[in-house]
UniProtKB/Swiss-Prot annotation:
Belongs to the bacterial ribosomal protein bL19 family. The lineage of its organism: Bacteria, Bacillati, Mycoplasmatota, Mollicutes, Mycoplasmataceae. One of its GO terms (biological process) is translation. InterPro entries: Ribosomal_bL19, Ribosomal_bL19_CS, Ribosomal_bL19_sf, Translation_prot_SH3-like_sf. It comes from Mycoplasma mycoides subsp. mycoides SC (strain CCUG 32753 / NCTC 10114 / PG1). Coiled coil: none annotated. GO terms for molecular function: structural constituent of ribosome. The gene is rplS. This is Large ribosomal subunit protein bL19.
């Protein structure tokens, strides 16, 4: 491999590493998160929140994305977010859920109380409740 080729590969890695976000929180399927997205309207930007259940996480590095499901006006909406995208302003963890699958597509078929997910409380909160 020539030195020119290795330089271009290194420069590509540098560009990708500069675009990676380091402020992402740790979450997984079953958790409820709020994603704040920048939306351009004319010449201005505004922030729109999308809060829902994480159905799937996928990819690694710059391609890491997440599918979030929420109910809006009686209709369920699923949206895919590439988390290292510049349009993502912030991601906030609302609550942790206990599921045994990494991709919880079965939640689409459930309705009402059957669609609930058991909440996991941090140890401090669990001790305070008891």
């Amino acid at each position: 491999m020539s030195s020119k080729a290795t330089k271009t590969v290194k420069s590509k890695f540098d560009i990708i590493n500069n675009q990676l976000r380091d402020d992402l929180i740790d979450f997984r399927s079953g958790d409820t998160i709020r994603v704040d997205v920048k939306i351009k309207e004319g010449y201005k930007f505004r922030i729109q929140s999308f809060e829902g259940l994480v159905i799937k996480t996928q990819g690694s590095g710059i391609t890491y994305s997440v599918v979030v499901r929420k109910m809006s006006n009686g209709v369920f909406v699923e949206r895919t977010f590439p988390l290292h995208s510049p349009i993502i302003d912030s991601v906030t963890l609302i609550k942790r859920g206990k599921v045994r699958r990494s991709r919880i597509y079965y939640i689409r078929k459930l309705s009402g109380k059957a669609a609930r997910i058991k909440e996991i409380m941090p140890t401090k909160q669990a001790k305070e409740i008891k």
